[in-house]
């Protein structure tokens, strides 16, 4: 080990580790390098999208599953011609399908942009404003909570204990007269 470097049993040249487990910034021992290479990092921005099941969390199960039978129904005894009923079904289904696709094509990306900005702002405000305000409030309220606790233990506890002892001997007899 001369000059701050050493050679392992396989002939690889390494710098001297800063600590026994290796450099915390850059792994320079084989065990740490292998351990880091085995870990798989998953990023929410690079995950694959399921093009078959587009509602995996079932957000829209009750709301938008509208079929022809959910909207238009003819009761017994009041039926239109079979051809009209079939044409109405086809017209409704195809119109709903293609108009949804048209609206998605026109407004899907702008709406995704708007909702992405909205939730980014919401996340930003929650992380950088709401949580720090709540933590600050909890720190500041500790002083008041201690004073309040002392007040309750020195004034309220004895007072309510005395009132409880006064009324502990009260007996109520209910008689039902017929």
Curated annotation (Swiss-Prot):
Q: Where is this region: Interacts with SPRY1, SPRY2, and SPRY4?
A: 149-160
Q: Where is this region: Interaction with CAVIN3?
A: 82-94
Xref: PROSITE patterns? CAVEOLIN
Instruction: Say where the protein is mainly found.
Output: Golgi
Topology term for the membrane: Peripheral membrane protein
Q: What residues bear Phosphotyrosine in this entry?
A: 6, 14, 25
Which stretches of this protein does UniProt put in the Cytoplasmic compartment? 2-104, 126-178
- Positions modified as N6-acetyllysine? 5
Instruction: Please give the superkingdom of this protein's source.
Output: Eukaryota
The membrane spanning regions, by residue number, are: none
Q: Keyword Calcium, does the record have it?
A: no
**UniProt keyword annotations, A-Z:** Acetylation, Cell membrane, Golgi apparatus, Isopeptide bond, Lipoprotein, Membrane, Palmitate, Phosphoprotein, Ubl conjugation
Stretches the record annotates as Interacts with SPRY1, SPRY2, SPRY3 and SPRY4: 131-142, 167-178
Keyword ATP-binding listed: no
Q: Which InterPro entries match?
A: Caveolin, Caveolin_CS
* Described function: May act as a scaffolding protein within caveolar membranes. Forms a stable heterooligomeric complex with CAV2 that targets to lipid rafts and drives caveolae formation. Mediates the recruitment of CAVIN proteins (CAVIN1/2/3/4) to the caveolae. Interacts directly with G-protein alpha subunits and can functionally regulate their activity. Involved in the costimulatory signal essential for T-cell receptor (TCR)-mediated T-cell activation. Its binding to DPP4 induces T-cell proliferation and NF-kappa-B activation in a T-cell receptor/CD3-dependent manner.
Quaternary structure and partners: Homooligomer. Interacts with GLIPR2. Interacts with NOSTRIN. Interacts with SNAP25 and STX1A. Interacts (via the N-terminus) with DPP4; the interaction is direct. Interacts with CTNNB1, CDH1 and JUP. Interacts with PACSIN2; this interaction induces membrane tubulation. Interacts with SLC7A9. Interacts with BMX and BTK. Interacts with TGFBR1. Interacts with CAVIN3 (via leucine-zipper domain) in a cholesterol-sensitive manner. Interacts with CAVIN1. Interacts with EHD2 in a cholesterol-dependent manner.
Q: What is this protein called?
A: Caveolin-1
């Amino acid at each position: 080990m001369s000059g701050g470097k050493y050679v392992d049993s396989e002939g690889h040249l390494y710098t001297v580790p800063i600590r026994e487990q290796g450099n915390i910034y850059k792994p320079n021992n084989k065990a740490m390098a292998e351990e880091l290479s085995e870990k798989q990092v998953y990023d929410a921005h690079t995950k694959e999208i399921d093009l078959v099941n587009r509602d995996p969390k079932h957000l829209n199960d009750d709301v938008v599953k509208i079929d022809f039978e959910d909207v238009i129904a003819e009761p017994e005894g009041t039926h239109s011609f079979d051809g009209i009923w079939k044409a109405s079904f086809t017209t409704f289904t195809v119109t709903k399908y293609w108009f949804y696709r048209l609206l998605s094509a026109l407004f899907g990306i702008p709406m995704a942009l708007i909702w992405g900005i909205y939730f980014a702002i919401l996340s930003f405000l929650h992380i950088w404003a709401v949580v720090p305000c709540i933590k600050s409030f909890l720190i500041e309220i500790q002083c008041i909570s201690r004073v309040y606790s002392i007040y309750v233990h020195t004034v309220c506890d004895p007072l309510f204990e005395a009132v409880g002892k006064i009324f502990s001997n009260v007996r109520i007899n209910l008689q039902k007269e017929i």
